[in-house]
């Protein structure tokens, strides 16, 4: 059976809530306007790869600064030779994920898949390889964050 969410505006965010899950839609750089208490999970399918490098740094800093201790996450990125195609989507590999989130989260790479054949736009652009990565962002035992 489907759930019917209650929808409310919280500062610059539209928050939909049902079944104990709340989803806030808005600009991630405005997260300080939300009460993040009780947030337990982060899912990023396309935000990190949609942003140019300077904004990715700010994005990661914002998340690390506003998410409560104990938050876990899943982030999915793609990686290819960025010199062959201007983004977005931008290429974000494992080293960058570790650099951006490693001080806050224990990072485990869950997959590294060849997805070139599933992306005809990249094939048509002459991109020779395209990888999709999924990373678990776990609780860092000695993070000392509260």
Question: What are the functions of these language-model segments?
Answer:
Residues 1-35, 60-146:
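Class I (Rossmann-like) S-adenosyl-L-methionine-dependent methyltransferase catalytic domain
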Residues 21, 38-39, 47:
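Local beta-strand N-terminus motif with an aromatic residue
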Residues 26, 43, 51:
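A conserved hydrophobic position in a structured secondary element of the catalytic/binding core
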Residues 34-42:
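A short acidic, Gly/Pro-enriched loop at the edge of an enzyme's catalytic core
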Residues 48-51, 87:
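Flexible, glycine/proline-enriched loop segments at strand-loop-helix junctions
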Residues 50-62:
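A short, conserved alpha-helix within the catalytic core of class I
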